[in-house]
């Protein structure tokens, strides 16, 4: 990579409300609220401040069903006041919350490390190839209904991989490696391709910089 003559890679355009990203669109600016998502007034007010400061997407956490349901009120409050900013719901641990949030926001972020797999316990797990395939089928069976909800509501998704929350299953098979991070994403991305769902954003991050160097063949 020539760091002094950088050029953007050609990417697919992803529809996120009325503010698409990727393709020939400019790099978008997103910020996240730190309000309680059940506090409609505070969340709307902070989202407005983000937009007024130049934010193009506003992300809110949705820890549970109640928070996900209240995204409808936050969205309505913003639109009522003329703020058409796309909202992004941040989901961890509970795919049912993602199902609800997808009905009220323009994009939903899921974490592959805890969307279907159990919370990380740092245990080494042994799988036969057949058992591993069964685990992948569980992901497929849970993820496809979510994609169908997103299709119905024109909701984009972000597959957001965190090195710190890779599942025990991925860690046991691939180790603490860039390949494990990539495969955690690809398990979900392959399903998106199979289901012809293209409004997908990908993020892969790690706090350990020595870990995020990914070789060209992997990329």
Where are the model-predicted features located?
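Glycine-rich, proline-tolerant flexible connector loops at the mouths of alpha/beta enzymes
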Residues: 34, 55-78, 112-131, 200-207
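Alpha-helix-loop-beta-strand connector modules within alpha/beta enzyme cores
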Residues: 67-88, 138-152
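Structured alpha-helical segments in the cores of large, soluble enzyme domains
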Residues: 17, 40-50, 98, 146-152, ...
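Residue-level detector of conserved catalytic or cofactor/ligand-binding positions
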Residues: 210-219
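Active-site mouth loops of central-metabolism enzymes
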Residues: 25-42, 87-93, 170-180
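Glycine-rich tight-turn/loop motif centered on a GG-T
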Residues: 4, 105-142, 169-180
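N-terminal amphipathic alpha-helix/helix-capping segment at the start of soluble metabolic enzymes
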Residues: 1-31, 151
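Hydrophobic faces of well-ordered beta-strands that scaffold small-molecule active sites
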Residues: 27-33, 58-60, 87-91, 108-110, ...
């Amino acid at each position: 990579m020539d760091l002094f003559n950088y050029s953007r890679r050609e990417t697919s355009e992803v529809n996120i409300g009325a503010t698409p990203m990727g393709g020939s669109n400019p790099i978008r600016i997103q910020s996240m609220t730190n309000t309680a998502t059940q506090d409609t007034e505070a969340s709307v007010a902070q989202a407005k401040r983000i937009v007024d400061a130049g934010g193009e997407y506003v992300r809110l956490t949705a820890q549970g069903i109640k928070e996900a349901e209240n995204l409808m009120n936050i969205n309505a409050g913003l639109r009522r006041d003329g703020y058409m900013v796309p909202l992004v719901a941040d989901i961890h641990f509970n795919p049912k919350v993602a199902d609800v949030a997808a009905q009220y926001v323009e994009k939903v972020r899921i974490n592959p490390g805890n969307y279907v797999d159990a919370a990380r316990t740092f245990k080494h797990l042994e799988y036969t190839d057949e058992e591993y395939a069964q685990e992948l089928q569980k992901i497929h069976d849970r993820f496809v209904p979510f994609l169908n909800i997103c299709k119905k509501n024109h909701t984009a998704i972000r597959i957001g991989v965190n090195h710190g929350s890779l599942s025990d299953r991925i860690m046991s098979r691939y180790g603490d490696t860039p390949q494990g991070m990539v495969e955690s994403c690809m398990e979900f991305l392959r399903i998106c391709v199979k289901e012809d769902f293209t409004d997908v954003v990908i993020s892969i991050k790690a706090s350990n910089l020595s870990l995020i160097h990914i070789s060209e063949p992997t990329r």
